């Protein structure tokens, strides 16, 4: 009885190992990326023609044409940038 149980457990472990090897080899041979990214769903960032500067009161000058001000660190001059694409910001209003 004990011999049969040990043999059964060894066979079960062997089958599990073969199953894992088969799954790994099937996924490793795949040439496609796992998450398809289409250019239709991407976001395009581009700089606008204007620059923005920090005023003496600490506020930044406004960018126009759907652009916003981007600056690095403590710099007092930045560039206006626009994002185009399929993105959705969550609403600040509670859902009904």
Swiss-Prot record:
Q: Which GO terms describe its cellular component?
A: extracellular region
UniProt keyword Cell cycle, yes or no? no
What are the alphabetically sorted keywords of the record?
Disulfide bond, Glycoprotein, Secreted, Signal
Tell me the leader sequence span: 1-28
Kindly indicate whether the keyword Cell membrane belongs to this entry.
no
Domain of life the protein comes from? Eukaryota
Q: Name one GO molecular function term.
A: C-X-C chemokine binding
Residue pairs linked by disulfide bridges in the UniProt entry: 48-67, 52-69, 63-80
Name its cellular compartments. Answer: Secreted
First-listed, main subcellular location of the protein, grouped into a coarse class: secreted
Please list the residues annotated as glycosylated.
74
* Biological function: Salivary chemokine-binding protein which binds to host chemokines CXCL1 and CXCL8.
Q: What is this protein called?
A: Evasin P1074
